[in-house]
């Protein structure tokens, strides 16, 4: 059994024109930038910050999943998950230590 023979006819450019592809580095390297709503806590006399630094990955223009914030992010403290609500034992009270923490569940609040 023989394989079928395929014949292709190609036209060549007789003028001898050459195309040159030159690769160039991006104009700017990726870097950290601050949004307009970021507050500088270092020089405001505050003792602590409620949130840590937040990295926002670049968005892909044709991928809607990169447009919206993650589900685990909250309005005031992005990047941290909300703690699960613990039910207090019936007839008793939960510890005051847990009630003093902020809503985001991170160790900064």
From Swiss-Prot:
Gene Ontology cellular-component annotations: nucleus
UniProt-listed InterPro entries: PPI_Ypi1
Molecular function GO labels: protein phosphatase 1 binding; protein serine/threonine phosphatase inhibitor activity
Lineage top rank: taxon: Eukaryota
Record region (Disordered): 63-109
Record's protein name: Uncharacterized protein ZK945.8
Compositional bias of kind Basic and acidic residues: 73-87, 94-109
One Pfam family this sequence matches: PPI_Ypi1
Organism: Caenorhabditis elegans
